[in-house]
């Protein structure tokens, strides 16, 4: 019979997702039902994304929040506007604090983004439109762009 040394497993650096949740969700469908009949062409979609990171009271626990806003328009109507704040609570275990910024800005958002994307797709479909499928986001590129802007 062999024994497993759990001490080495506990010392392994890893990210634990303790919770995921919708903090705020709003969908406006201001021109319905007229806008639903006028969907011959693809609407123009304006999309914005922001990431907020909050250090929670417990050591190495952080809330990472994705703020996603999308507005769809055609030449006649504002079709819909959706705003979602989706967050996760992450515990960075046995990870050097110098690595926290990149993990919290890149890896943690990438872990929760698919869930936020699904919520937006479902809500827009439930509003009578084609589901808004947001393209995958390169959080690493966003992080490096933000870092280079801060250096300039």
From Swiss-Prot:
Family annotation (Pfam families): SecB
Signal peptide bounds: none
Alphabetized UniProt keyword annotations: Chaperone, Cytoplasm, Protein transport, Translocation, Transport
InterPro entries: SecB (IPR003708), SecB-like_sf (IPR035958)
Segments forming a coiled coil: none
Entry's family note: Belongs to the SecB family.
Protein name: Protein-export protein SecB
């Amino acid at each position: 019979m062999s024994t497993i040394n759990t001490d080495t497993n506990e010392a392994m650096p890893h990210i634990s997702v303790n919770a995921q949740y919708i903090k705020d969700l709003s969908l406006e469908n201001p021109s319905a039902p007229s806008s639903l009949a006028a969907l011959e062409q693809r609407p123009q979609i304006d999309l914005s994304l922001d990431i907020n990171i909050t250090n929670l009271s417990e050591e190495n626990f952080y809330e990472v929040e994705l703020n996603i806003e999308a507005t769809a328009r055609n030449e006649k109507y504002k079709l819909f506007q959706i705003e979602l704040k989706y967050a996760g609570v992450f515990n960075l275990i046995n990870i050097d604090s110098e690595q926290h910024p990149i993990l919290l800005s890149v890896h943690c958002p990438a872990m929760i983004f698919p869930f936020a994307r699904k919520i937006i797709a479902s809500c827009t479909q439930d509003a009578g439109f084609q589901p808004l499928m947001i393209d995958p986001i390169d959080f690493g590129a966003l992080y490096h762009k933000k870092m280079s802007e801060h250096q300039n």
